[in-house]
From Swiss-Prot:
Organism: Escherichia coli O17:K52:H18 (strain UMN026 / ExPEC)
Gene that this sequence comes from: fluC
Designated name of the protein: Fluoride-specific ion channel FluC
Catalytic activity of the protein: fluoride(in) = fluoride(out)
Major subcellular site: membrane
Annotated compartments: Cell inner membrane
GO molecular function, one term: fluoride channel activity
Pfam families: CRCB
């Protein structure tokens, strides 16, 4: 149990730092859409999709790696709370269209990236 807790801790910290770096680099590029948060959510959705696809086929993988990558890293990287706050900020500024676009792109994009990862993994392992 301690190994699993440490894996979540290490993965979560690493994912959080990655999210912060993405936000620092990309959020200033566009005033209405926080591109760093979007990138974090899309990358995290892709990684978790690939992870779940891989772990479902590779049943001998140590559970420590599973929680390090999915619960830890992807949990720290992706951020529904920051995304939600940014949508509220856009609404408070009267930017309804940008707020709706942000919701649409984050949600649909995350679903699409997860599905893409599953598809790519399946295609690459089909023999």
């Amino acid at each position: 149990m301690l190994q699993l807790l440490l894996a979540v801790f290490i993965g979560g910290g690493t994912g959080s730092v990655a999210r912060w770096l993405l936000s620092m680099r990309f959020n200033p590029l566009h005033q209405a859409i926080p591109l760093g948060t979007l990138a974090a959510n899309l990358i995290g959705a892709f990684i978790i999709g690939m992870g779940f696809a891989w772990f479902s086929r590779m049943t001998n993988i140590d559970p420590v790696w599973k929680v390090l990558i999915t619960t830890g890293f992807c949990g720290g990287l992706t951020t529904f709370s920051t995304f939600s706050a940014e949508v509220v900020f856009l609404l408070q500024e009267g930017r309804l269209g940008w707020a709706l676009l942000n919701v649409f792109v984050n949600l649909l994009g995350s679903f699409a990236m997860t599905a893409l990862a599953f598809w790519l993994f399946s295609a690459s392992t089909a023999h």
